[in-house]
Amino acid sequence: MAKPATVKIKLVSTADTGFYYVTKKNPRNITEKMTFRKYDPVVRKHVEFKEAKIK
């Protein structure tokens, strides 16, 4: 079987709440770390989420 093209990553909140989203990315197309402004329900605001590895 072939190796899957996408890998699962964790988007961790920069507000240090411990909240995170899980998404997929293709590391061949996107080599840099992903950052998004998404909603953090713990602080009830949009904050920046940065990519981290899933352990």
Curated annotation (Swiss-Prot):
GO terms for cellular component: cytosolic large ribosomal subunit. Gene3D superfamilies: Ribosomal protein L33. Keywords: Ribonucleoprotein, Ribosomal protein. InterPro entries: Ribosomal_bL33, Ribosomal_bL33_CS, Ribosomal_bL33_sf, Ribosomal_zn-bd. PROSITE patterns: RIBOSOMAL_L33. GO terms for molecular function: structural constituent of ribosome. GO terms for biological process: translation. Belongs to the bacterial ribosomal protein bL33 family. This is Large ribosomal subunit protein bL33. The gene is rpmG.
